[in-house]
Structure formats: structure tokens, C-alpha cells
């Protein structure tokens, strides 16, 4: 079984965590922005159907 030989430093751990959080925040901001533009009807980069055909 693979086991890490040495302990990861706090700086490296914090750097990785900050990067992960930055990516998550960017993704959340993007989705919120898209939702707002869809609600306002000003979307240009997203294709969707207004009415569902049954």
C-alpha cells in the first residue's frame, strides 16, 4: 500500500486548499451570473428552451 514518506507542510496544504476554494468560488460566481442573466432575459451565451413541449 502506498504511504507518503514525509508530512506535507502547512504552507503547501494551505496553498492547495486556497486554490481549491478559489476555483469553487469562481465556479459559483459564474453559475450565479448565468442564472441572473437568464432571469433578466439578457443571456447571449446560453441556449435553452422557454417552453417544454409535452
Curated annotation (Swiss-Prot):
Keywords: Chloroplast, Plastid, Ribonucleoprotein, Ribosomal protein. The keyword Transport does not apply. It is found in: Plastid, Chloroplast. One of its GO terms (cellular component) is chloroplast. Pfam families: Ribosomal_L32p (PF01783). Its main location: plastid. It comes from the Eukaryota. GO terms for molecular function: structural constituent of ribosome. This is Large ribosomal subunit protein bL32c. It comes from Thalassiosira pseudonana. The gene is rpl32-A.
